Amino acid sequence: MLDNLTSKLKKLTTDVKESTHSLLDDAGKVVDRAFDKHICIGVTGFSGSGKSTFITSLIHQLRYSNEAGLASFLAAREQRILEVNLLSSQGFDLFDYQEGISALSAKPPQWPQPTQSLSSVIVQIVYKRNSVLNRVLGETSTFNIEIRDYPGEWLLDLPLIGQSYLNWCFDQTDLAKQAVRKHLLGDLLQHLQAINPFDVFDESQIKQLHQQFKRYLRQCKEEGLTLIQPGRMLLEDEHNESPVFFPLLGLHHYDKTALADANDKSIYKVMSQRYQSYIDTIVTPFNKHFFDDIDRQVVLVDALKVISGGQDNFEDMKTWVGKIATFTYFERTKANSYRHPLFKAIR
């Protein structure tokens, strides 16, 4: 009994320490934001849209800001930048700035490798103050610009949060009516339309159709389409253990109440559960833990490629942009709500 009590006390002590460290870390972030000492920028876009090139260029401009001619960067214009350092961000791989520079400066120049996972870099700017507060706060100050890079394919899934499997299937059914998607689906379209949602779930059959659906998603991307869900299925070797599911494209023929009351072993119920599991275990944690600290969001779109793909591709992009623009990414704190423009924070 004493050993059990001792074990519980140790666990309680550990939990208290972890909670305290987490609280202090969060408090530090709030203080930094309140005094304009830190800003976090999220950068995303489909693979090939230029994220790595954009971030490499942005870091390079900030590192050599005294020579870059950044009109809005007053401290740089007045030659008050003392040093710029690149730091790692806790919990993220370091963005490979040097690889980007090497690729762009090679002979002949090459594009940097596309983003396949999360990465981040903190650009720490040390500068001389130009303020009446110099006597109180000191002549120099530090401002951190954190840049987070992540695949745009991850962003595609965020609108799924709060959307039921049934409504997602209805959306996918409407998309399948587009000529380009109908062509890409081929025989798979008839298979997904013909499935009886009340039939008993057959794992082997579902896995075969799942592989065909993944190939269809990749073909959509190759054709320049933008609204592709689930987006994680586009990334090779990414989340191989994620739930196996796909949309049923004939659900408009069935009564909604009957579908809701379907047997737990039916195709519809199992698919619904796996869809929700995908959202709960993959999409929601990404939204909660990644976006909570982001102050600005940059989304890069290869508009020229989309436009050259035709009217369907253009309308597809408009729908996608509309979905991500209206999605609530995170709950903003008060310290996060009254942000100054980026370079206004460096005075």
Regions found by a protein language model. Name each.
Residues L2-F35:
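N-terminal pre-Walker A segment at the start of P-loop NTPase domains
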Residues A27-G28, F35, Q61-A345:
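Switch- and interface-adjacent substructures of P-loop NTPase systems
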Residues I41-V43:
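Hydrophobic anchor at the beta1->P-loop junction of P-loop NTPases
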Residues F46:
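P-loop (Walker A) phosphate-binding loop of NTP-binding proteins
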Residues S49-G50:
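Conserved glycine(s) of the Walker
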Residues F54-I55:
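Post-Walker A alpha-helix
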